[in-house]
Amino acid sequence: MSTFRQEDVEDHYEMGEELGSGQFAIVRKCQQKGTGMEYAAKFIKKRRLPSSRRGVSREEIEREVSILREIRHPNIITLHDVFENKTDVVLILELVSGGELFDFLAEKESLTEDEATQFLKQILDGVHYLHSKRIAHFDLKPENIMLLDKHAASPRIKLIDFGIAHRIEAGSEFKNIFGTPEFVAPEIVNYEPLGLEADMWSIGVITYILLSGASPFLGETKQETLTNISAVNYDFDEEYFSSTSELAKDFIRRLLVKDPKRRMTIAQSLEHSWIKVRRREDGARKPERRRLRAARLREYSLKSHSSMPRNTSYASFERFSRVLEDVAAAEQGLRELQRGRRQCRERVCALRAAAEQREARCRDGSAGLGRDLRRLRTELGRTEALRTRAQEEARAALLGAGGLKRRLCRLENRYDALAAQVAAEVQFVRDLVRALEQERLQAECGVR
């Protein structure tokens, strides 16, 4: 963000007469206190709210100041200082007091092509410097081509008003609708990408007017003018160009080309034979024709200043440009929506592909699970069979155990019976033995 001096400009400069005004700017002559140096103070009305159409936005002011601070060329106005207050940004600029070039030429009794090219060469030099820095002026027109001092032997051209100038960045697309309808290029009218080539078209229009005093595309209405520009509807009327050289016409033809890429560049224009050749055979031209051309230029200059208030056409065109800016913003929003839609579609496709891959993996997993399940079922069947067999064997074993138990009980009963019988027999034997013993004893006693 550019920083401007937050001081009262009138503490440093004494303000004088008004030199000119536009839709949102007033230019006043001023004198620096202490040095007595004279400058031009351009008061630019700031836009208070982003949504407002009144005033100039901060971004636009900073862009103009940034460009003016960067450029230093004999044929371009110089920025001296910048102040800011609550309502305005004030540019302290070089004082260009010689008036407009066309007014100066209109005052001349006659005008030769050589004189015209001398001034045009200065315009081309200034534009060449701008284009070397990738800066497009975008508002080249007679009232922005001034003389530093019209009383000098060789008056110096000064290009002024960089309010809509832009840096043309490589790789970035820039579109806008601005400028003065009579001088704008077809790509501006048709809202197409803009570049340095737009300035070259304006130079072609300026040259046409300079040599004829007529405007090539000017219609009865602004819409007719814009239609003529878009269709490149112009010709070299014999009434205006009877004394104009073919080289001059060729120079104009190479500039008034609809396709910007086929239009002559600033470097090519400086190398054009009409600009390079300084001396011409003026004897072949009739002096009265040259006087007539100067008179027509005078008529054009008077008409351009008196037919309507200054910058009215620009104001209307700017309002139209605001509408197109809104349309452009809507188109940009639509493009963003379409881009978002494409991104959503791409995401849906990616999600669908991921889902299909997951489904395929699930199918593969399901097939594996099916195989495992079948294997488990087989194993389970085998286990069930083994369990059934084991149960049957257990039942058989239990049944066998019950039989054995019953046999054991019977054996135990038989054992008990035999034991009782044996015990009785043993007792009998014991009794028998005892009886026999007694008998033996009695027998022995009897013997004695």
Swiss-Prot record:
Protein kinase domain boundaries: 13-275
Control of this protein's activity: A sequential activation is proposed: autophosphorylation at consensus sites is leading to dimerization of the catalytic domain and activation segment exchange (producing an active confirmation of both kinase modules in trans) followed by phosphorylation at Thr-180 in the activation segment and at other regulatory sites. Phosphorylation at Thr-180, Thr-225 and Thr-265 is essential for activity. Inhibited by pyridone 6 (K00225), a potent, ATP-competitive inhibitor. Phosphorylation at Thr-180, Thr-225 and Thr-265 is essential for activity.
Tissue and organ expression note: Highly expressed in heart, brain, lung, skeletal muscle, kidney and testis. Lower levels in liver and spleen.
Annotated region described as Interaction with CDC5L, given as residue ranges: 390-448
Positions of modified residues (Phosphothreonine): T180, T225, T265
InterPro entries: DAPK3_STKc, Kinase-like_dom_sf, Prot_kinase_dom, Protein_kinase_ATP_BS, Ser/Thr_kinase_AS
Subcellular locations according to the entry: Nucleus; Nucleus, PML body; Cytoplasm, Cytoskeleton, Microtubule organizing center, Centrosome; Chromosome, Centromere
Cross-referenced Gene3D superfamilies: Phosphorylase Kinase, domain 1, Transferase(Phosphotransferase) domain 1
Example GO biological process: regulation of myosin II filament organization
GO cellular component, one term: centrosome
Molecular-function GO terms, alphabetical: ATP binding; kinase activity; leucine zipper domain binding; protein homodimerization activity; protein serine kinase activity; protein serine/threonine kinase activity; small GTPase binding
Cofactor: Mg(2+)
Keyword annotations of the record: Activator, Apoptosis, ATP-binding, Centromere, Chromatin regulator, Chromosome, Cytoplasm, Cytoskeleton, Kinase, Nucleotide-binding, Nucleus, Phosphoprotein, Serine/threonine-protein kinase, Transcription, Transcription regulation, Transferase, Ubl conjugation
PTM text: Ubiquitinated. Ubiquitination mediated by the UBE2D3 E3 ligase does not lead to proteasomal degradation, but influences promyelocytic leukemia protein nuclear bodies (PML-NBs) formation in the nucleus.
Record's keyword annotation contains Ubl conjugation: yes
Modified residues (Phosphoserine): S304, S306, S307, S313, S321
Principal subcellular localization: nucleus
Residue positions of the active site: D139
Subunit structure: Homooligomer in its kinase-active form (homotrimers and homodimers are reported); monomeric in its kinase-inactive form. Homodimerization is required for activation segment autophosphorylation. Interacts with DAXX, PAWR, ATF4, NLK, TCF7L2, UBE2D1, UBE2D2, UBE2D3, and CDC5L. Interacts with AR; enhanced by AATF. Interacts with LUZP1; the interaction is likely to occur throughout the cell cycle and reduces the LUZP1-mediated suppression of MYL9 phosphorylation.
Summary of the function given for this chain in its UniProt record: Serine/threonine kinase which is involved in the regulation of apoptosis, autophagy, transcription, translation and actin cytoskeleton reorganization. Regulates both type I (caspase-dependent) apoptotic and type II (caspase-independent) autophagic cell deaths signal, depending on the cellular setting. Involved in formation of promyelocytic leukemia protein nuclear body (PML-NB). Involved in apoptosis involving PAWR which mediates cytoplasmic relocation; in vitro phosphorylates PAWR. Regulates myosin phosphorylation in both smooth muscle and non-muscle cells.
Note from the entry: A species-specific loss of a key phosphorylation site in murine DAPK3 seems to direct it mainly to the nucleus which is proposed to be compensated by the interaction with PAWR to maintain at least the cytoplasmic basic membrane blebbing function in the apoptosis pathway.
Name of the protein in question: Death-associated protein kinase 3
The species this protein was found in: Mus musculus
